[in-house]
Structures are given as structure tokens and as C-alpha cells.
């Protein structure tokens, strides 16, 4: 069979594996936390909590329109995550295969053994990622993270494909600098458009920009004649330039554009001028064959086009839907919505911090310090801060150790249970003495303890070292993606203690990058077997040894992960959130007011009222939102479904 067809068949089998797995385990209805709000908002295009996800809502609305009944709307919106996750697994396979074949040389000279190694690497890495704890968690519910990870993987695959096509095209053109005139650069425009659309899903996808920048640098600007010092100085310079471009997108375009509209006072005229300037720039730079400028104008234009999905927030808020978080129907409120002002400011590089002498954080008289980590003014958090001697200790122990490394090891070493605060484990006697292992009694509790004997971790670490030894440039690019989507997020979020839920789902981009190394690690093992047998055994023995070793690695890592994780990741019979919300609403008197407090006792109710039309006469009041003026005004002035406004005696000015 032609190798191209074998490639396609293998990729198709990986896709079918992921699709079948997620269809078998997808939630049949609403889940706890944000999915209730996501589904309700997608069904009638309402405004969910800041900074919103308008492009996700548009896709969710499309899927909901295909539902045969109101009761199946939730499953259809969940299906969006299923398809996005299956697509991500396919892309993971393709990326690993491309990375491995990069150092194997010209494909025309690739031996059968090398071909088997590259395909097996992709299968092992992709399947391992498909059954990893956090990614599988996102794959079966109506959440933005599955689609966001798909955008990340798609951008990574596209830039690697661009790199290969650009080198092939340059080789045909001969000597000289042709970069800005390459036909392959259309891939860069597509990537820019994907970044624009990803803004309307989740900003996490934008972090792949640094991977893109490094691949472009190593493909077009790196020179073998450079010394090590010269090369790293230029890498730092490229990093600084890419950081400047990144911040030009966020917050430059994302927040800066609405602020420009506000400053000018006429959004329509301002938008029209921007469109005309960009159109003229594209035309003139193309006419004058100004390659770099034309590429820049094209990329900026498609980013704006992708970002345009945010007009949905502004337009829909003006209709005052029942779910209208922050009421962003004016430019001023829209900017506040984008900047997440509802959640307060978090210092990044400089600000006040916890004073060990006074035992508190004093915002008024406290001295500003560099790299403040213990910054929360909540007195409950001070009781946690006092356990740490410094901000650095809190950063290393809690923010990195507890809020990232623990999640990382959940995915690639093992997880003690599904109880909040559960530790990581290995399952190896004598190595888990650090962990507080709860007694697990019920079947569901026992299913929640997953042990992998740290085999995925070891295989990924080996893959990282092997990758650096074979192709340090792309290995470094993967490392930057791994770091930025992991520790980089930790640095930026500057999280306070006592988080209301586990946040492992935020770091799936980092776990995706590590899964690439799991696949490469499998390829490294197979390559060592192949090298050992190349001159000493027949082709039949070589192939049998490669396939046998590959099968053992597959069973030991992704196979075992799948067996361990299936039980507690199977949501196919989980109706608890919907039943809970149904009981809450139906226990309320006619035209009653039902007070809730958090996400889990609010969002499933919103879903039932908005989508399934259950007890729309009940007014759900979220107490945690009552301290915001926009929510109090909505309760006072606006009806919600069949419930009347509340008789709030406070005047508009008092609110």
C-alpha cells in the first residue's frame, strides 16, 4: 500500500478512536460549574460571564439548532467539545509524526523502519493525550477549553507545515532571500485568522503565538554560521519582538480597539476608517510588491475579522436577555467586561503584599514591592499567607507546586482521588509517602484513584531529552510552548489560596506540549531498538522487534492510562446536575424567588429555565452577584422569562 494512504489510514484510526471514546463518555445533559451557563447562553445567544466567548457561543448555537428537542440541546452543545477534542487528538498525532520525520531526513530516503517509528510515535503520543486526566475532563462537557486546545493544536500543526513548505519552495527558487514572497505564507495568514477567532473562544490559544514566532525564526532567519552566543542573543531578540507583537494583540487590539471607539465617540465611523486603511494598505503593498508590509496588513486584517465576533456581546446585551452578565451594552461597560473588572485587579510585577509583622495586606498604606504573590485583601487568605515566610516561598510551594506541578503529575504520574485538594501519586510502594491518601470505600470513590506508575512522566522526560539531542530548535520551541502554557499562566494569574475548585483544566496546553514528548519518547525507544538491530538482524526481525516494542510501550502508557481513567471520566449516565436543578425549581412556590450563591446552584437552574423551559415563573437570584450595580438593576427593572421584576425599594441612584 502507498505510504501516503497508510499515513491517512493511521490518522483516520486515531481520529475514530478519539471520537468513539468521547461519544461513549460524553455528558448526556448539563454538568456542574460553567456548562449550564454556556449552554443557556449558546441556545439563545445571551451574555455570559466576562470576558465572554462569543465565537464559541455562535458555534454552540449552531449545534443547538440541530437538536431534535429541548432536552437534547445540552448533548448537542456537549458534542461541540467532543468533535473539537477528537480533532485535537488527530492533530497531536500529525504533529508528532512531523516532528519525528524532521530529523529522519528526506522522506524519499526514509527506510521502512523509520517510517514505522514515526507512525508509532504519533499514535502513542496522541492516544496518551486523548486519555489524560485534564484533557478528557474537558472533552465531554460544554466548555471552551476543548475548542481552545483545538485552536492551539491547529496553529502548531499549521506552522510546522508552513515551515516544511517554505523550505521546499525556497529550495526551488534558489539562492537569495525570498521569505516575504513565498506562497507558503498564506499559512501565516490563516494562523493569524485562527488567532482572531480564538479570541472569541479563550485567550489561552494566543499563547501558541510564541511557538509560531520561534518556528518562523528558526526556519527563515537562523544561520549555521552564527556562534552559540550570537544565536541566543538573536533568539532573545526574537522573543522580545514576538512579545511586543503579542501584547499588541492583547491587550492592544482586544481592549485597545473599544477604547479607541470610546475616545473617538463614533464606533461606526472609527471601524469604517480602520477597514479603509487596512484595505488600502493591502492593495498598495501588493501593488508595490512590499512583501513584509503586505503580510503584516493581511495578518492584522484577518485578526480584526476574527475578533469581530465580539460584536455579538454588544448587540445581544442591548436586547436585555435574562442572562446579561455585566450588561455590556455601552462602550464603557463593554471595556469593563473585556477587562474583567468584576473580578478586581491582580498585581503582576509590582504591588502591595502580605506584611508578616502586621499579619495583613494593607492596600492604603502598604509599601509596594516587586513580584507580589501574597496580595489578596481577603482576611481568610491571610490565615494561609502566615504559613509562608516570604512571597517567593508562597510562589514556589503553592502557586507552582500546588496549582501546577500537582496537576501536571495528576496527568502523567497518578491521582490520589477526585476529592478537592487530592495529591499526586505514582502507585509505587514507598514513593507515595508524601501523599495524604484518603480511604476510598464506594465504587465511584475507588474509580477516582488513578495510578500510572509515573510511566507517562518518564517517557515524556526521555522524549524531551531525546528531542533536544535530535532537533534542539524544535525541541526548544516545544519547551517554550510547554512553559508558557504552564508556568507562564501561573505567573500571570497570581492566584490566591482557597480556590473554589481545581484549576487543572487551564493548563491543558502545557499537557498537550508534554504529550508531544511522550510520542517522541516512544519514537526514541524504537529508534534505539532499530539501531541495535539494523546490521545484525533481517528486515523481518527488525519489523517484528519494532512492532512488538511499540505495542509494549502502547500498552504500558496510553493503554494503561485509558483503563485507569475510564471509570471516573465516563459521564454518560450522570444526570445529577440536571436532576438537582429540576428539584430545586420544582420545590419553589409559584412565582417564587429562589436565592442561590455559587456557580453550581445557579448555572444548572439557568439552563433548565432557558433551554428546557422548566419553571420560568421562578426568579433565580444569585447572592454573589448582588454586590454589583448592574445585577441589582436587572432584578429591579427587568423581567426574566415568566417572572416579574423584583419589588426592590432602592432607587436607581441608591443602587
Task: Pin down the residues of each PLM region.
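Short hydrophobic/aromatic helix or loop-helix immediately within or flanking a transmembrane segment
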Residues: 42-72, 82-83, 90, 433
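N-terminal membrane topogenic signal
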Residues: 1-13, 114-116, 183, 229-233
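Alpha-helical transmembrane segments
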Residues: 7-21, 123-127, 190, 236-244
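ER/secretory pathway lumenal C-terminal domains and tails of membrane proteins involved
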Residues: 77, 97-103, 135, 141-149, ...
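Transmembrane alpha-helical segments of multi-pass membrane glycosylation machinery
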Residues: 73-93, 102-105, 110, 114-121, ...
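Extracytoplasmic catalytic/substrate-binding loops of multi-pass membrane glycan-assembly enzymes
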Residues: 26-38, 48-60, 324-326, 400-401, ...
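Alpha-helical transmembrane segments of multi-pass membrane proteins
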Residues: 18-29, 415
